[in-house]
């Protein structure tokens, strides 16, 4: 009987990490994990305060808009965030900027007020089935050219772009 209990505990302990990784980081959140109507932390209905401390290394100014909101969670505490899967603006695709047309042809559907923001590439809602909440299916990261090719068309095989669909969780026509 003692061996059965030990075996049961071991199976449970070994399965917990697998279960935790089966879901995306936002999957355990309800709408109120990010959105707050009566207790909003800023002018928008979000439960988190926009990050006013993180500095865009390319412009040397604080991030604004939706990117500042994303960085409220996804930046290190010393840079004004909550430290949840922090992104590095030095080792990430540039964000919080107006795209350079000499480097990329960015579709209007991924721009916010003419800028490349976090939500241009990511849709963080749990209904998004894509790898890393990207707005384009990359088959779990194995076909990143589908994603990069949205804007950097000269860097990919054009035939790989013919079936690209940009995910939008707010599209209720599905």
Functional labels for PLM-detected ranges:
Residues 1-8:
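Bacterial N-terminal signal peptides that target proteins for export
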Residues 10-13:
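Short, linear, compositionally biased motifs with a strong N-terminal bias
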Residues 15-19:
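N-terminal signal peptide c-region/cleavage motif recognized by signal peptidases
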Residues 21-113, 119-174:
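Flexible linker/context regions in extracytoplasmic redox proteins
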């Amino acid at each position: 009987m003692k061996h059965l209990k030990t075996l049961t505990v071991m199976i449970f302990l070994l399965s917990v990490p697998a279960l935790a990784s089966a879901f995306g980081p936002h999957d355990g959140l309800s709408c109120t994990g990010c959105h707050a109507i009566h207790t909003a932390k800023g002018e928008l209905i979000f439960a988190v305060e926009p990050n006013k401390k993180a500095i865009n290394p390319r412009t040397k100014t604080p991030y604004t808009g939706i990117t500042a909101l994303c960085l409220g969670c996804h930046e290190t505490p010393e840079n004004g965030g909550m430290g949840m899967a922090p992104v590095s603006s030095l080792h990430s695709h540039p964000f919080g900027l107006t795209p350079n047309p000499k480097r990329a042809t960015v579709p209007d559907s991924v721009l916010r007020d003419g800028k490349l923001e976090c939500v241009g590439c990511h849709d963080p809602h749990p209904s998004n089935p894509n790898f890393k909440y990207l707005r384009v299916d990359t088959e779990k990261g194995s076909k990143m050219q589908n994603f990069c090719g949205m804007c950097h068309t000269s860097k990919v095989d054009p035939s790989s772009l013919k079936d690209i669909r940009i995910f939008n969780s707010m599209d209720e026509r599905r």
